[in-house]
Amino acid sequence: MPVKKRVPFVAFRTRVRDETIGGPNPYRWEVRTTEDYFSGKRVVLFSLPGAFTPTCSTQQLPDFERLYDEFGKVGIEAVYCLSVNDAFVMNAWGKALGLEKVRLIPDGSGEFTRKMGMLVAKDNLGFGMRSWRYAAVVNDSVVEQWFEEEGFSDNCESDPYWASSPQNILETLRTFDTARLGRVPIKF
């Protein structure tokens, strides 16, 4: 997905907590669109192969949660994690990891991922169609910066991870912000 392109319009089927429902599963369906997530704000979107998978659960998502406040310091208003998983899986994953800041977006059918050009087969792992690992800075629905792991392909034997890490994105944003404002970075 080249920079300066608008994110595609997609409606996501989410499950949101609703205390008026009561019982052991107080959630209702809610449709949220890409406009709801991206319009009028500057956000980081990162996408990964799947909920509950090793790198995603032990490094990428926990690190974004831990570094969330650092993104606010460089003008990011929200951080979203998207995966080709349904709302039930994404909610259970967020609960299992104790997420409080990063918001999860369920791309159950893979429609958004396909329209972003990032849908790949992971049949070699028994996953079916999933997202390639990537991240983007999205400013008012337009891709401002793009971070894609190398080796994009179906049934990739490896699981590359660095370009879309929060550490790399923060470093890039800090450098970009410094250059944009004409500041010289201070090194200690």
UniProtKB/Swiss-Prot annotation:
The keyword Oxidoreductase is assigned to this record: yes
GO biological process terms held by the UniProt record: cell redox homeostasis; cellular response to oxidative stress; hydrogen peroxide catabolic process
Catalyses which reaction(s): a hydroperoxide + 2 glutathione = an alcohol + glutathione disulfide + H2O
Enzyme's top EC category: oxidoreductase
Catalytic center residues: C56 (cysteine sulfenic acid (-soh) intermediate (for peroxiredoxin activity))
Protein name: Peroxiredoxin y4vD
Sequence intervals crossing the membrane: none
Quaternary organization: Monomer.
PROSITE patterns: THIOREDOXIN_2
UniProt entry tagged with the keyword Methyltransferase: no
Annotated function: Thiol-specific peroxidase that catalyzes the reduction of hydrogen peroxide and organic hydroperoxides to water and alcohols, respectively. Plays a role in cell protection against oxidative stress by detoxifying peroxides.
Superkingdom of this protein's organism: Bacteria
Keyword entries, A-Z: Antioxidant, Oxidoreductase, Peroxidase, Plasmid, Redox-active center
Molecular function GO labels: thioredoxin peroxidase activity
Thioredoxin domain boundaries: 2-152
SUPFAM superfamilies attached to this UniProt entry: Thioredoxin-like
EC number(s) recorded for this UniProt protein: 1.11.1.27
